[in-house]
Amino acid sequence: MRKLLLMAVAVCCSAPTFAQTDVQPVVGGYEGDLYVNVGSADYVEDNDLRMYAKVFVNASEDATGKVDFSLPNFSFMGIKLGDIFLPTIGLNAQNGVYTFGENPEVRLTFNTQEIGTILADAKLDDAQTYVKGDSIVAYIPVKWVQSETQKMPIAVLFKGVRVNPYALSNYNFNDAMRWEQSRPWDSKNGYFDWTTLKDNDEYWGQSKWQMEEYITPDAWCVSHVMGMNGLGATVVGAPYSTNGDEDNPDYAVRLTNTPNPFMPTQVVPGYMTLGTSFASASVLDLNKADGGTFGGVAFTGKPDAIQFDYSRSHTQAGDTLYAAEVINSEEPATVVAYLWKGQYKQEAVPGETAYTDPSTVTMYGRERNILDIKTTTGGAATKSDDAACIAKVVKSITGNVEGKLETIVVPLDYGKYAGTDVQPDSLNIIFAASDYFGQRSKVGAGNALVVDNVKLLYYHAIKDASYNGNEFVFGEDKTADFSTEAYVPANLQFTKVGQGATVEQTYNAETGVLTITVKGQDVRFNPESVTVYTIQFDAVKTAVAGVKADAAAEVAPAVYGIDGRRLAAPVKGANIIGGKKVIK
C-alpha cells in the first residue's frame, strides 16, 4: 500500500504544471472591421458586409487569469440589438500568441423596436480566435434562437488592432462606414431616437431636411438641431470630398453656418465636438438663444499640440442667397480644445427649442464652466475638489483658404500645469465655422469650415542645452562635439520639450559618447515618436578626471591622539588632524 501511495505521489509530481497566464498584455480596446454573415455559419470577408466596430478584452473580476470579451452595440440587417458579452474566458500564451480557452454558449436577450425581443446564443470560437501583438482576430458563432429546435446561424468575424489611447479614434473621416446617423440631444428628450421619427409624417412634413442628411462622423457630434417637431430643424454639417474621386473619395467634414429654414435671420452655427452639442431658444424671446457643448471623451494623454488640415470660405456682401443682415465676411472660424479632470456641474441649463421657457437640466462638463468663461444661461456652477483645467486653447482662424487644404498646428497651453505630473481624465475638441464664443447675432450665414486629418502631436526634443554654462546647439544630425572636454554629468543642462515625454541618458566610458534618448508619450503606438541626441566627450580626460576624483576621495588627513598614536577616527576630546589640533 505504501508503495502504491509513493508511486501516485511521484506521478502527480511529474505531471506538467502551468503558470497562470498574465492577461494584461491583451487587455484593452480594439477597433477594426466587423463582418456579419446572417443565415450562414461561414465566416466571410465581404466588403458589402463590413462595418466598423470596437471590441474589448477586460480582466475578469470573477476569476484571476481570465478575461471578459465584449462586442458593444452589435447589429445586423439594420437592426440594432445590443452588447455581446462573453465572460470569464481562459487565456493561453505561447510564442507571443494568445489564444482563448473553451467557453460555453451564453444566452443573450436583445430588445428591439423593429421586431421585438430576440434571443441569441453566442460564444468565442476558441479554435480560431487569437491576439498577436496589437492585432486581434475574433470568430464569434451566434445563433438566433427562433425556437429551442430552430436556430439561425450568424457568423460574426472581427479583425482589428489595439486602440491607440493617445490618438483620436476617427481623425481622417475617410471610411464611409464611420459616417453614421447623428443623435441630436435636447433637455426634454435626451438623445433623439430616430426609430420614433422614421415614420412620423408630421415631423418630416414640417422639416426641410431628410433623415439621411442628419449624419455625423463616428466619435464626433455635428451640431444639427431638431427644432420643434421638425419645425426649424437645421442641418449644419456634411461629408466633403477633397479629391473629387467618387470611387475612392477622401472625405473631410464641412461645417456651415446655416439659417433656420423658417426664420432666415436666425443662423444656426455649424460646429462639431468630441462631446455633445446642444441648443436652446425661446420662440417668444429669441434673445435668450444659447448653445454649446458638454462632455468629451475619456483621455489621459498629454498632447502638446493639435494638427489638422482645413479650408475656409465666407459669404460675401451682396450674395442674394442669404439675408443681408446675416452676412459676416470677416467672421473668424474657431478651434477650441481642453484637457481637464474632475467634475464640473451647472444647474438649470436650458437645452431645447420651445415656444416659451425651454426645459432645463443639470449639465456636466459644460465647456464654459471648464474654461472659466461666463455663461448667459443656467444656474449655479460648481466643481469637485479635484477639478482642474489642465491645458487649453481657443484659436481664431481668419481669412479665406479656398480650393485647397492647408495644415495648421495649434499648441496647447498647460499654464501652471506645464511640467507637472497632474494627469487629465477627459478631452474635448471643437471645430466651429463661427466665432464660437462670440455673439450669436454675428454668426455669418453660409460661412464654412472644412476640417480633415485631425492629429494630436506629442513632442520629443530638448532645448536650451548648455555645458559648463555655455549654450550650444545640436547639429541637424542631433550631434554635438565636446571632444576636448571631460564629461561631468552636473555640467550638462537642458530643457525637455514634450509634456508627456521621457528622457534617458547613457554614457559609454570607452568611447566618450553620451546618448540622450527622448521619447514622446505616444511612442508605444508611434515608433517615430523618438529623438536621439549624441554628444562626443574626451574619453581619456573623463577617465583621468574620474581617477583623480576617486583618489582625492580616498586620501583623508591622518588622525592622531595627543599621545602621538594614530587613530582610525577622531575621539572625544583633543585630536591632531592634518597637523592641527582639533577638539571634538
Where in this protein do the model-derived segments appear?
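Bacterial Sec-dependent N-terminal signal peptides
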Residues: M1-P25
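C-terminal outer-membrane/trafficking sorting elements
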Residues: A15, K541-K584
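Edge beta-strand at a domain terminus
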Residues: Q20-G29, V36, M51, D83-N95, ...
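Short, solvent-exposed loop/hinge segments that bridge or flank secondary-structure elements
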Residues: V27-T64, N111-L119, S187-E202, Q206-S207
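Predominantly extracellular/secreted and cell-surface proteins with exposed
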Residues: L49-D126
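Beta-sheet ligand-binding and adhesion/scaffold domains
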Residues: T99-P165, G275-F278
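Aromatic (Trp/Tyr/Phe) and Gly/Pro-enriched flexible surface segments
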Residues: R162-Q307, N328-Y458
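Beta-rich interaction/scaffold domains
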Residues: Y459-A543
